[in-house]
């Protein structure tokens, strides 16, 4: 299964991705982790990214897509993966789709964790209070408001893009973590046993 999790900051994407990884053998692919790994490995695209980052510049979408293209060919991604932190806008989504099409594949689903902004604020405040050493710098109302504004501006068109393609699945992210996990498994047609998602997505048993 090739999957994207969408949701605003504090929605619990990381937790849900980790649960899917552990229960269903999907590997969580973080854009930042992939960039650092590509640089460390000295791959061709990693060297390009290293030079760009050394200049303090943002890594272009085509370079990030190239790194993703290399990463999903690795053995641990054979059972599927969850993209974390990419795409963030429609242009990136189109570039990702083009790359996957070139490999003769496509995304299976895009899961949106729907969470009310006011609930997110409470979650962030709770997380900040529980963090050892004091609140994280970005865990305050002003920082969250800015992050949510950027998220909504970028992601609203992205949600519409995947909805038009029939890929979007939306769950109620305001439920408990266990309930959200259950919803995700339900909309994807997967059970606690690995591999059962295939029959739901393809109609084959």
Curated annotation (Swiss-Prot):
Q: In which pathway does it act?
A: Purine metabolism; AMP biosynthesis via salvage pathway; AMP from ADP: step 1/1
- InterPro entries listed in its UniProt record: Adenylat/UMP-CMP_kin, Adenylat_kinase_CS, P-loop_NTPase
Q: Set out the biological process GO terms recorded for this chain's protein.
A: AMP salvage
Where is the stretch described as LID?
A: 126-139
Give one GO term, molecular function aspect.
Answer: ATP binding
What the entry lists under Gene3D superfamilies is as follows: P-loop containing nucleotide triphosphate hydrolases
For this UniProt record, the keywords arranged alphabetically read as follows:
ATP-binding, Cytoplasm, Kinase, Nucleotide biosynthesis, Nucleotide-binding, Transferase
A Gene Ontology cellular-component term: cytoplasm
Q: What is its main location?
A: cytoplasm
**Catalytic reactions on record:** AMP + ATP = 2 ADP
Instruction: Detail which positions bind ATP.
Output: 10-15, 127, 175
Work out whether the entry's keyword set contains RNA-binding: no
Pfam families linked: ADK (PF00406)
Q: Which domain of life is it from?
A: Bacteria
For binding AMP, which residues are annotated in this chain's numbering?
Answer: 31, 36, 57-59, 85-88, 92, 136, 147
Query: According to the UniProt entry, what is the EC number of this protein?
Result: 2.7.4.3
Report the subcellular localization. Cytoplasm
Region annotated NMP, chain positions: 30-59
Family membership, please give it: Belongs to the adenylate kinase family.
Quaternary form?
Monomer.
Q: How does the record comment on the protein's domains?
A: Consists of three domains, a large central CORE domain and two small peripheral domains, NMPbind and LID, which undergo movements during catalysis. The LID domain closes over the site of phosphoryl transfer upon ATP binding. Assembling and dissambling the active center during each catalytic cycle provides an effective means to prevent ATP hydrolysis.
Write out the function statement from the record.
Catalyzes the reversible transfer of the terminal phosphate group between ATP and AMP. Plays an important role in cellular energy homeostasis and in adenine nucleotide metabolism.
NCBIfam families membership: PRK00279.1-3 (NF001381), PRK14527.1 (NF011100), PRK14531.1 (NF011104), PRK14532.1 (NF011105)
Protein name, entry field: Adenylate kinase
Q: Which organism is it from?
A: Parvibaculum lavamentivorans (strain DS-1 / DSM 13023 / NCIMB 13966)
Kindly list the organism's lineage.
Bacteria, Pseudomonadati, Pseudomonadota, Alphaproteobacteria, Hyphomicrobiales
What gene is this protein a product of?
A: adk
